[in-house]
Curated annotation (Swiss-Prot):
Chain ranges of the TRAM domain: 393-461
Major localization class: cytoplasm
UniProt keyword terms in alphabetical order: 4Fe-4S, Cytoplasm, Iron, Iron-sulfur, Metal-binding, S-adenosyl-L-methionine, Transferase
Cellular component, GO, one term: cytosol
Lineage: Bacteria, Pseudomonadati, Pseudomonadota, Betaproteobacteria, Burkholderiales
Localisation: Cytoplasm
Domain MTTase N-terminal, residue spans: 13-128
Task of the protein: Catalyzes the methylthiolation of an aspartic acid residue of ribosomal protein uS12.
Biological process, per Gene Ontology: tRNA modification
Co-factor note (free text): Binds 2 [4Fe-4S] clusters. One cluster is coordinated with 3 cysteines and an exchangeable S-adenosyl-L-methionine.
Matching InterPro entries: Elp3/MiaA/NifB-like_rSAM (IPR006638), Methylthiotransferase (IPR005839), Methylthiotransferase_CS (IPR020612), Methylthiotransferase_N (IPR013848), Methylthiotransferase_N_sf (IPR038135), NA-bd_OB-fold (IPR012340), Ribosomal_uS12_MeSTrfase_RimO (IPR005840), rSAM (IPR007197)
Primary gene name: rimO
Protein name: Ribosomal protein uS12 methylthiotransferase RimO
E.C. numbers: 2.8.4.4
GO-annotated molecular function: 4 iron, 4 sulfur cluster binding; aspartic acid methylthiotransferase activity; metal ion binding; protein methylthiotransferase activity
């Protein structure tokens, strides 16, 4: 009996790498190579031994531009499969098009600097990752603890504010924004995995990019500023491709928020960038806000809320507040109640102030007794629930788009664009009578609203 011929080993994919430019570009190269090695690629020392070549360019002076263009041309001649990254990737020609694409139209892809995520995306597209039986057990979207149809997308870590009641900066540090390409890659992987709703979170979503001076990143060859407005636009465009939702949380009431509201109200992203803002106002009286060291204490918050509603009548505003903060007088608390009535906030949470170890608010004079703090919280919620009930009642008779979260013996439970998971209300959906109207978890369905209480809705498909 003849011996079975040995199975030839599968060749490990090889990537050639050319690094040009300054030490900052060198660090970018190191990060890309580190990621390539971590994913199982070999780094080839020659063009002809590589399956493709990555060229990290410099575009600072004319000599560097020419050197980079020459290196790209050499890589194309010697290998033929070239991905270009670095500063020259962001440079335009005299005609306004990309300089590299104009000179070397056969390159596979071009990115700007600091584009690890986008470079890896293009490498994966043209040279799939080597199979690893252990790593491949982990989905591209990562392991999630949420249901499959929605996920949280964290865009930054830390916070630059020093609110007196909060100790987050001491635990998580100052603001560090994630590179925009990394955020977009994660969002795309989540949508590809079946996620229908992305909930954008951070400690301060409005401040995204402040720490990097709104540096321009690149995604799929397009420049995107590391800035909330630009990121929301890019996420909205991506969500539209997958018929999905994007919901914004922890948005401080800065003027820049005015730029996001139109995306919710009109244009190609309407219905994808949800008309929903989670804005942690915390209080409404200027003296209390000053003691809290809230960053929005100088903003004309009520005027801004009214402007947002004029721009987007369907806007849902959720917020959280603190009742019984040290030094809060009854008059100041009444100002807060008046604000809730006038602003007509849709969803509201309130906490009775509680000292947190390490918070500077502990040093403030005027600490209130526990019973006063709790009594004010209860009065606050009574007013807030009255306002919420009036706004919710207006939805009865309307047909709303609902994302189904759960199926049970009584039908389904879902959420409208006005409701974030866990913290807002739900829609109780009657069982579908017709087979054509049956739904499952993760489906979007049109629901005719037939009833409401102060928090939730009831309806039928």
């Amino acid at each position: 009996m003849s011996a079975t011929p040995p199975i030839a080993p599968i060749a490990t994919p090889k990537v050639g790498f050319v690094s040009l430019g300054c030490p900052k570009a060198l660090v970018d190269s190191e990060q890309i190579i580190t990621q390539l090695r971590a994913e199982g690629y070999e780094i080839s020392g020659t063009y002809d031994g590589a399956d493709l070549v990555v060229v990290n360019t410099c575009g600072f002076i004319d000599e560097a531009v020419q050197e980079s263009l020459d290196a790209i041309g050499e890589a194309l001649n010697e290998n033929g499969k070239v991905i270009v990254t670095g500063c020259l990737g962001a440079k335009k020609s005299a005609s306004g098009s990309g300089l590299i694409e104009e000179v070397h139209p056969k390159v596979l892809a071009v990115t700007g600097p600091h584009a690890l995520g986008e470079v890896m995306q293009h490498v994966h597209m043209h040279l799939p990752k080597p199979h690893d039986p252990f790593v491949d057990l982990v989905p591209a979207a990562g392991v999630k603890l949420t249901p499959r149809h929605y996920a949280y997308l964290k865009i930054s870590e830390g916070c630059n504010h020093r609110c007196t009641f909060c100790i987050i900066p001491s635990m998580r540090g100052d603001l560090v924004s994630r590179p925009v390409a990394d955020v977009m890659l994660e969002a795309e992987n989540l949508f590809k995995s079946g996620v229908k709703e992305l909930l954008v979170i951070s400690q301060d979503t409005s401040a995204y990019g402040v720490d990097v001076k709104y540096r321009t990143g690149f995604w799929n060859g397009k420049p995107i500023k590391t800035r909330m407005t630009d990121l929301v636009g890019a996420l909205g465009e991506l969500a539209a491709q997958y018929g999905a939702w994007v919901r914004l949380h922890y948005v401080y009431p800065y003027p820049s928020v005015d730029e996001v509201i139109p995306m919710m109200a009109e244009g190609p992203f309407k219905g994808h960038v949800l008309p929903y803002l989670d804005v942690p106002f915390q209080h409404a009286h200027p003296e209390v806000l000053k003691r809290m060291k809230r960053p929005a204490n100088a903003e004309k918050v009520m005027e801004r809320v009214k402007k947002w509603r004029e721009m987007c009548p369907d806007l849902t505003i959720r917020s959280t507040f603190i009742a019984g903060f040290p030094g809060e007088t009854e008059e100041q608390f009444q100002t807060l109640l008046d604000f809730i009535r006038e602003a007509e906030l849709d969803r509201v949470g309130c906490f009775a102030y509680s000292p947190v170890e390490g918070a500077t608010a502990n040093e403030l004079d005027g600490a209130l007794p526990d019973e006063v703090r709790e009594e004010r919280r209860a009065r606050f919620m009574e007013v807030a629930e009255e306002v919420s009930a009036k706004r919710i009642a207006k939805k009865v008779g309307k047909t709303l788009k609902v994302l189904v979260d759960e199926i049970n013996a009584d039908g389904g439970i879902g959420r409208t664009a006005a409701d974030a998971p866990e913290i807002d209300g739900v829609v109780y959906i009657a069982p579908a009578v017709k087979a054509s109207k049956r739904y499952k978890v993760g489906d979007f369905v049109s629901v005719k609203i037939t009833g409401a209480d102060g928090h939730d809705l009831w309806g039928e498909v």
